[in-house]
Swiss-Prot record:
InterPro entries: Mediator_Med27. Belongs to the Mediator complex subunit 27 family. Component of the Mediator complex, a coactivator involved in the regulated transcription of nearly all RNA polymerase II-dependent genes. Mediator functions as a bridge to convey information from gene-specific regulatory proteins to the basal RNA polymerase II transcription machinery. Mediator is recruited to promoters by direct interactions with regulatory proteins and serves as a scaffold for the assembly of a functional preinitiation complex with RNA polymerase II and the general transcription factors. Required for the development of dopaminergic amacrine cells in the retina. One of its GO terms (cellular component) is mediator complex. This is Mediator of RNA polymerase II transcription subunit 27. It comes from the Eukaryota. It is found in: Nucleus. The lineage of its organism: Eukaryota, Metazoa, Chordata, Craniata, Vertebrata. It comes from Danio rerio.
């Protein structure tokens, strides 16, 4: 009896309730069996109906009695105590539903983040190795003379060499017109016309690309005094995004020891916009998303993506 009080359940009433459930099921089964058999053969139809109704009422009353008995016993059973220790079985209700657990999406996001981190770490490692920033502490301690500061030679390349590099790049891409201007002396400004899609103004310092402005093919690229406008943005959001992506590409294509390779790689990437409005997104397969074409081009594969689909 002490166990019964500790648990909070009347085990005797619980046993009687189980017997009452069995009795209720039996009485309900008798009702359906009686209905299945139908009226028994009697002398007259009237006598058969009276006997059928009488027996049917008796069966229903039996079901009602068993149901009332079960309800009475259910009030005597009681409820389990809330403070009763369930040990590890009490943690079963805390398990999440498998269908509602976003495990796959979280793992996929973590994989993308890890892949992107590894990619950028590789780029950073290659750039640091190119800069030759490693110095030995012993060399710095034993050397009494300071090393002479090395002046970057690539910033003062001959203009003829720069012109030859730009000319070779122009011959590589017949569908891309490159015009070279020198409005401020030695610094070059390139006017790149890509088919009938866009025009890009590339401001350079020797063979280093300083900035890029992309505008539509029919947009004005000159100021009032007929000079190239290297500051104003495009009036169209699509070309504004291409300008932003071009700035990102300048940060990606960095190779100080071979600036001609950087310019050629950037021009190859820029030429991939020749079908800006004709190439669908490689992720969603749509030509337009929120009214914009896929303005992003992958730096390695040159595949087209919408700005939101590339994430």
């Amino acid at each position: 009896m002490a166990d019964v009080m500790n648990v909070g359940v009347n085990l005797e009433a619980f046993s009687q309730a189980i017997n009452a459930i069995q009795a209720l099921r039996s009485s309900v089964t008798r009702v359906f069996d009686f209905l299945k058999d139908g009226m028994k053969n009697k002398e007259t139809l009237e006598s058969r109906e009276k006997v059928f109704i009488t027996e049917f009422q008796e069966n229903l009353q039996s079901v009602n009695r068993d149901l009332n008995e079960l309800e009475r016993l259910s009030t005597l059973v009681g409820r389990p105590s809330e403070s009763h220790p369930l040990h590890n079985s009490g943690l079963l209700s805390l398990d999440p539903v498998q269908d509602k657990t976003p495990l796959y999406s979280q793992l996929l996001q973590a994989y993308k983040w890890s892949n992107k981190l590894q990619y950028h770490a590789g780029l950073a490692s290659s750039l640091l190795n190119q800069q030759s920033l490693k110095r030995s502490a012993n060399q710095m301690g034993t050397s009494a003379k300071r090393r002479p500061k090395v002046q970057p030679s690539t910033l003062a390349l001959p203009t003829q060499y720069v012109d030859d590099v730009i000319s070779r790049i122009g011959r590589m891409f017949p569908d891309m017109s490159i015009e070279l201007f020198r409005p401020n002396g030695t610094s070059a400004v390139l006017l790149v016309t890509l088919g009938k899609v866009l025009k890009a103004i590339v401001v350079m310092r020797s063979l280093f690309i300083d900035r890029t402005i992309v505008r539509g093919f029919h947009e004005n690229i000159y100021t009032e005094d007929r000079k190239l406008d290297i500051w104003s943005k495009s009036n169209y959001q699509a070309f504004q995004k291409v300008t932003d992506h071009a700035t990102t590409a300048l940060l990606h294509y960095q190779l100080p020891q071979m600036p001609d390779v950087v310019v050629r790689s950037f021009m190859t990437w820029l030429r991939s916009y020749i079908k800006l409005f004709q190439t669908p997104c490689q992720r969603c397969g749509k030509y337009l998303q929120e009214g914009l074409p896929p303005t992003w081009r992958d730096f390695r594969t040159l595949e087209a993506f919408h700005d939101t689909c590339r994430q």
